[in-house]
């Protein structure tokens, strides 16, 4: 399965035979389904799986109803609510959507771990969970990673010729910190 920048639902994917086709369903679930099929087919021999979820990259919605439900009415606490000109309502909306996408990833990682348990592979399998970058969730008036977008009611004047006014390149800890968890037998 090779794809990138795909939507959270009904992605166009390339098959192992090199054909592209639209696959109906939620992308996280589809990737996990393929992973579970591979694990089941290879459970009796050594294997390596590299499962790359596209979430929680935007767009975050749609997600399965059970992933959205805990967050749909949430009034999230945001890190810098007093940042000058911050669009607080937009930060809260995006935070709810982001958390729902994270919940989808969490649920699907759980499906993989449950399959390893069910197939008695847990004691012989190393699982590494990591990300490709951190994320700004309103900190410093920004949203996204190191090439963050401003999340202000109005953008400041453009300061650099080659950087759009709505962008804020950064090396803040929130962009750089990469989550990692390892489950070792």
Enumerate the predicted regions with their spans.
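Active-site-proximal cap/lid insertion segments
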Residues: 1-185
